[in-house]
């Protein structure tokens, strides 16, 4: 099992000062958040992408992936290509952050890239409902 799945943090959100809902009481991973269930990890990922749009003015899938997985530590181009192929959208598409289907598909594709296995869509949808 990958670290992201073990931590119920399928998109591998790094620890910082954010007090996410659904965090495990004991944060056993020094680098990445640990959530009590996968839907809370998906919720955090969805909220982060929405904040990229609302707070940082990042509108396109390309901008989101470049911020999420910067080239200094990730194969950003491969990540972007994988996500865009999975969701059937071009890299410069600007998805509506209020569109459940599109946002859940993007996050599911990101999870697949991060963990090497398809996301459990029921968990992704539960994450959306927790927003």
Residue ranges and their predicted role:
Residues 1-131:
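Cell-wall polysaccharide-cleaving catalytic domain and substrate-binding groove, primarily
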């Amino acid at each position: 099992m990958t670290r992201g799945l073990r931590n119920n943090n399928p998109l591998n959100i790094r620890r910082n000062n954010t007090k996410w809902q659904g965090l495990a009481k004991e944060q056993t991973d020094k680098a990445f958040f640990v959530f009590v269930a996968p839907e809370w990890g998906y919720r955090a990922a969805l909220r982060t992408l929405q904040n990229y749009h609302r707070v940082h003015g990042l509108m396109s899938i390309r901008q989101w992936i470049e911020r999420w997985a910067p080239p200094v530590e990730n194969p950003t181009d491969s990540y972007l290509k994988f996500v865009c192929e999975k969701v059937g959208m071009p890299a410069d598409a600007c998805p509506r952050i209020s569109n459940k289907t599109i946002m859940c598909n993007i996050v599911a594709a990101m999870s697949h890239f991060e963990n090497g296995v398809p996301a459990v869509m029921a968990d992704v949808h539960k994450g959306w409902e927790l927003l």
